[in-house]
Amino acid sequence: MEQVSATARYLRIGPQKVRMLVDGIKGKSVEKGLNTLRFMPNKGAGLVEKALRSAVANAEEKNMDVDGLVILNVLVDQGPTLKRFRPRARGRATRILKRTSHITVVLAEKAAKN
């Protein structure tokens, strides 16, 4: 079973928010996964969809059958955290953490049933 993957890195969204979405598309066909993501109202859905389309393009480049592709796995890892400060009362400041994510989409050809 041949596999192909695509990675979107340094995305400005927290990994916890994206992980909630990806459980809904694992194991589905690419077409069903794209339809599911298209109708989700979250920012992360668009980012995962972009990574999924990139993986499909990589599969086309490897001359794989795009119609028979299945979403094998979607990994969401934490990227570097940007640290920002917000002024507060009495001359103090609080730290704001702006988290980033790395999304890896792994596709595989559907196993032929004998």
Swiss-Prot record:
It comes from the Bacteria. One of its GO terms (molecular function) is rRNA binding. Keywords: Ribonucleoprotein, Ribosomal protein, RNA-binding, rRNA-binding. SUPFAM superfamilies: Ribosomal protein L22. The keyword DNA-binding does not apply. Signal peptide: none annotated. GO terms for cellular component: cytosolic large ribosomal subunit. GO terms for biological process: translation. InterPro entries: Ribosomal_uL22 (IPR001063), Ribosomal_uL22_bac/chlpt-type (IPR005727), Ribosomal_uL22_bac/org-type (IPR047867), Ribosomal_uL22_CS (IPR018260), Ribosomal_uL22_sf (IPR036394). PANTHER family: CHLOROPLAST 50S RIBOSOMAL PROTEIN L22-RELATED, LARGE RIBOSOMAL SUBUNIT PROTEIN UL22M. HAMAP family: Ribosomal_uL22_B. This protein binds specifically to 23S rRNA; its binding is stimulated by other ribosomal proteins, e.g. L4, L17, and L20. It is important during the early stages of 50S assembly. It makes multiple contacts with different domains of the 23S rRNA in the assembled 50S subunit and ribosome. The globular domain of the protein is located near the polypeptide exit tunnel on the outside of the subunit, while an extended beta-hairpin is found that lines the wall of the exit tunnel in the center of the 70S ribosome. Part of the 50S ribosomal subunit. Belongs to the universal ribosomal protein uL22 family. This is Large ribosomal subunit protein uL22. It comes from Desulfosudis oleivorans (strain DSM 6200 / JCM 39069 / Hxd3).
